[in-house]
A protein has these predicted regions:
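C-terminal "post-core" interaction segments
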Residues: 1-253
Length: 253
C-alpha cells in the first residue's frame, strides 16, 4: 500500500520488496488507491522496478516540440517477472496514474478497481509583479500507448477521455471503501510501532478480486464478464426505480 510518491517512497518500497522476496513472494498487489501522486522521479523509479530494459514509461507532449520528453527504463528490472495487479480508484492521481498506465500498457500488470482521477499535466509558473505568479499548463502526460492521462473536466463531450481505466472494474460503496482504508492507515500512520496488519473487519472486494486473479481462481475474462453483468444489473435497477417513481408521481396527480 503506497500512500504517495515522496522522496522516501522508493527506498521504502525497495525495502519491502526485498523482505517479501526473502519470504518467497510469488505474486504482488501494488495498492495505489487514494494515492494523490507526488514526484515524477518517484513514479519513473517505481515503474523501473518491474519493467524490462528500454521500455517506455511515460512521455509528455505540448504545443511546442520542446515540450516533448520521453521517460524510459534504462536497465533490467529487479522484479521483471513477478505476477502483478495494481489497484486504483478515483483517488489515484498523477504519479499513481503514470505507474499504473505504464505497467498496464506494457502488459506488465493487470489494473483493478475504478477509473483513476485523471490528473497529469506539466505546469510552469510565470512570475508576475507583486510576488504573484501565473500557473500555466505547457504539456500533458501520455501513457506508452498514447493515452492522455489528464481528464477534460470542462468539455463533457470528452468525458470518456483521461484517467486510467481498470482491466478488472470493481464497483465499491464509497463509505465501505473509506472504512477499509481507515484500517490500512492504522499501519501506515502509527509512528514508533512495528507495522502489523490490524484485524480486517471490513471487506475489500477490490483486493479480493486481485487475489482471486493472481491465484488462478478467476480469469481476466471472467472478471470482466462479472463486472459487465454487475453494471447492467445496476443500470436496470436504476431504470426500474426511476420508472416506479414516475408512476407514483402520476398517480398522485
Amino acid at each position: 500500500y503506497v500512500v504517495d510518491f515522496s522522496g522516501h517512497t522508493i527506498e521504502a518500497v525497495n525495502k519491502a520488496l526485498k523482505e517479501l522476496k526473502k519470504q518467497g513472494m510469488k505474486s504482488l498487489v501494488l495498492d495505489l488507491r487514494f494515492n494523490p501522486g507526488g514526484l515524477l522521479t518517484g513514479a519513473v523509479d517505481m515503474a523501473k522496478l518491474f519493467m524490462g530494459d528500454k521500455q517506455m514509461i511515460v512521455y509528455t507532449k505540448g504545443r511546442k516540440k520542446d515540450f516533448y520528453q520521453e521517460f524510459k527504463t534504462n536497465a533490467k528490472a529487479p522484479y521483471p517477472d513477478v505476477p502483478m495487479v495494481v489497484l486504483v480508484n478515483q483517488g489515484s492521481a498523477s504519479a499513481s496514474e503514470i505507474v499504473s498506465g505504464a505497467l498496464q500498457d506494457n502488459k506488465r500488470a493487470v489494473v483493478a478497481g475504478q477509473r483513476s482521477f485523471g490528473k497529469a499535466s506539466v505546469q510552469q509558473v510565470l512570475p508576475l509583479s507583486g510576488g504573484a505568479g501565473l500557473r500555466l499548463t505547457i504539456a500533458k502526460y501520455y501513457t506508452p500507448a498514447g493515452r492522455l492521462i489528464q481528464r477534460n473536466y470542462r468539455d463533457k463531450s470528452k468525458a470518456d477521455e483521461g484517467g486510467i481505466f481498470p482491466d478488472i472494474e470493481v464497483e465499491v460503496d464509497p463509505e465501505q471503501e473509506i472504512k477499509v482504508f481507515m484500517q490500512y492507515n492504522k499501519v501506515v500512520y502509527t509512528p514508533g510501532k512495528k507495522a502489523q496488519l490490524p484485524e480486517m473487519t471490513e471487506k475489500d472486494p477490490v483486493l479480493d478480486k486481485a487475489v482471486l486473479y493472481l491465484t488462478g481462481k478467476l480469469t481476466l475474462e471472467q472478471a470482466q464478464k462479472e463486472a459487465a453483468e454487475a453494471k447492467a444489473a445496476k443500470e436496470a435497477a436504476k431504470t426500474k426505480k426511476a420508472a416506479s417513481k414516475k408512476e407514483t408521481q402520476g398517480k398522485k396527480t
